[in-house]
Amino acid sequence: MAGWSMVADEDAVDYSKTPKSLDANRSPESVNPESTGFEKKIKELISLFRPLLDSFLAEFCSADGFLPLPAMTGEGRTVDLFNLFLNVTHKGGFDAVSENGSWDEVVQESGLESYDSASAKLIYVKYLDAFGRWLNRVVAGDTDVSSVELSGISDALVARLNGFLSEVKKKYELRKGRPAKELGAELKWFISKTKRRYDKHHVGKESASNDAVKEFQGSKLAERRLEQIMILESVTQECSSPGKRKRECPLETLKWLSDVAKDPCDPSLGIVPDRSEWVSYGSEEPWKQLLLFRASRTNNDSACEKTWQKVQKMHPCLYDDSAGASYNLRERLSYEDYKRGKTGNGSDIGSSDEEDRPCALVGSKFQAKVPEWTGITPESDSKWLGTRIWPLTKEQTKANLLIERDRIGKGRQDPCGCHNPGSIECVKFHITAKRDKLKLELGPAFYMWCFDVMGECTLQYWTDLELKKIKSLMSSPPSLSPAFIHQAKMILPSKSRGKIVSYFYNVTLLQYRASQSRITPHDIDSDTDQIFLRATENENPAPEANTFQKPALLSPNKKRCR
């Protein structure tokens, strides 16, 4: 409570007045930050923010998945969530930053690179977005969330939070002279004031942080050597006393494994030598530590020697690289996969492709039951062939004896006997004659195979009023667009989609092509895609000109409707 309230009290200071005790010759840099006590306030502010965020994520965000802390970008850089929360809230919140495109500025102010804007946005959504909205509702006095009940938070911390939020609200009303009209306005106002002081404090600490990092890196080498000695000692202890706890993987090894997973071909990571050369390498190598750690984790026996005996059974060819003296980690087979390819006596079964093939079941229990042939054809066999539709039976073919047969080998007999050969009436006459002849030859199969709804025969199921309505919707050239089908369904509710599509392809499109072949036989473009492309190039704003003709698909299981 004290840290939060002191920051809020500092906002009420009138900075237009110059203190009398301030020396004009003293520069702002010469003022000791410790004298103002603001560094202590920032630390207390962060100490209240972090446990609240940890408890909130564990309480409300555990269902969405595990959120590791600290948060890291895709490049492996750690993100200061407190600084990110201050910067986003200072610029108006997540929605305002996204609408204004200010994520690059937020990323730079948060100490990240410009290409980390996408990662920072994702981290804010996962970690801080719900937390910020929850704080805004608490400040506004929402009865559902005003009582802070988070697991893992002490009563003293809850009291500090409640006191801080109430004081922020009081300071905002005192400064503005009215209550906040927008949800979260008090918290945004307070954070805007706090961010300016936090930035000054953060810049002042930056130089000291760089020195601390160098000092830490210098001591890190000695710490690593000590860790290697401890690892070597633990190897002896584990083999001599199997009852002790298993080996733990060092952080450096885990970092090396993470780098290998990101880019296995990175030359800076080094290469893994041949298995025969492993003995000459010490345990300080990351890959050697990783192998020892894996062996300790996969060892189920009490004796350490049994694990190495099992490892010795692995064939050396698994670790040999045909291209050179080293091999890639990704090309290595695991011991468990190789063990499955071994028989009981240790002989190889075959390649991995042969292992994946299903085994053929051989024996009397796995044979198909085939009845013995008696030489007599049972009458029940015909039921497996279904019902014969065509060719017709002898009784049905008696009516077809009077059908005029075409002469074989004579070819097409031209010209026809019509008054106007090649006219529309001539073509319709010959099509009708051929259809009637086919109807006599097929018999009932003519209707079962839906020949009666092919071509202009579809018109027999349409009334004159329905034809007049659907022709009024047709464009030139005709197009089977979704808008056309929707309008046709509106004015013809009794017609299904299948009937409308059938009419388009069997009547409208054929009549249009027939007119084209007679009127402009040398200038026919039947490709509807070309029409769409030309309309797009001319940038015709009319939606009808840019309609792309999509195929209308019908389900084969749908019943035929006339």
Swiss-Prot record:
Keywords: DNA-binding, Nucleus, Repressor, Transcription, Transcription regulation. GO terms for cellular component: generative cell nucleus; histone deacetylase complex; microsporocyte nucleus. InterPro entries: ARID_dom, ARID_dom_sf, ELM2_dom. One of its GO terms (biological process) is positive regulation of gene expression. GO terms for molecular function: DNA binding. The keyword Iron does not apply. Its main location: nucleus. This is AT-rich interactive domain-containing protein 1. The gene is ARID1.
